[in-house]
Amino acid sequence: MLGLLGLLGAVVAGLAFDSGSDPREDERESQDTPEGEAWDVSAAYLGFGEDEDAGTDHGGTEPDGQPISNDIPTPTDPDRDLTGTAGADQMTGGSGQDHLTAGASDDYLDGRAGDDSLDGGAGQDVAHGGDGDDGLAGGDGDDSLWGDDGQDSLTGGAGNDVLAGCEGDDTAQGGAGNDLVSGGAGQDQLAGGAGDDTLLGGEGDDRVFGGTGADEVDGGAGNDTLWGAAPGAADTDVDILNGGEGDDTLHLGAGDYGHGGTGADSFTLQDFGPGAPLMQITDFDPAEDDLVVIYDSALHPDPQLSLTAGNGATLLLLDGVPLASLTAGSNIDLAAIRLQAA
């Protein structure tokens, strides 16, 4: 299980540094223009602000050999507001706060510098936020969204999407479909939404929600908080939670697997009543880990916990009903387990 998550993390990293053809090398804005209309041709679209030599001092030297400064400011692009068509658009922003809206096809959007808004619409879209705090939306279709630098917000929509926050404190929502969501460096908040998703917190103290479906959630380095489903949701799909490095908190629902990893971890078990699948914790260490059972006071007015030995594990029971299987490096004492009303 952990090998799969590591492999998927490598896939995300590899995609981010793909050396193949990249439409950003073309340095082009969208050439799709609605019939009967024309783009507003301004200095920005004629190349001002795109010249790497803009603002260079050509003032010569003083008699003492010191350079003369003309104090020429480097031109910056105005905010770009581009709307594509039903065709396959290539849209590039500048250094301002750009708004790029593509149509219903397989589009490429690159916000570049500035706090940009990118909307791919329907289709299999690729969008890069670039530097700045960007908002990216994929819409329907199997989209790839990259926040790049900055505190970015990514929304995949329907489809099997790849969302990568990259650098910064990012938020990412997969939506419907089997999504791959990666936070990267920073304190990220990730949600898979509906579908069987894989979520990778990366470096930093992350909050990661699997959502509905059978999800795999990996916190990575940092003190992370992981949920297989939305808090309190009666989701019986089997989720796999791995805390990774750091002191992590794992919230398990019915049938979920939890592995804290290195560090002093906390496991929270949500009771869903008789008949719910057993939760399993594979590395509970009573010497350093914490275990909390959340119960319904209407179903359990006077809750009692008990333990019984199993095949290589310890079975935890609530009012005589099996709740979870615990694999521990040493004997477990009930004093190490806390009860908490929902």
Where do the PLM segments sit?
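Acidic glycine-/aspartate-rich tracts in secreted/extracellular proteins
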Residues: 272-275, 285-289, 293-300
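Short beta-alpha junctions and helix-cap segments that line functional grooves
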Residues: 277-279, 303-305
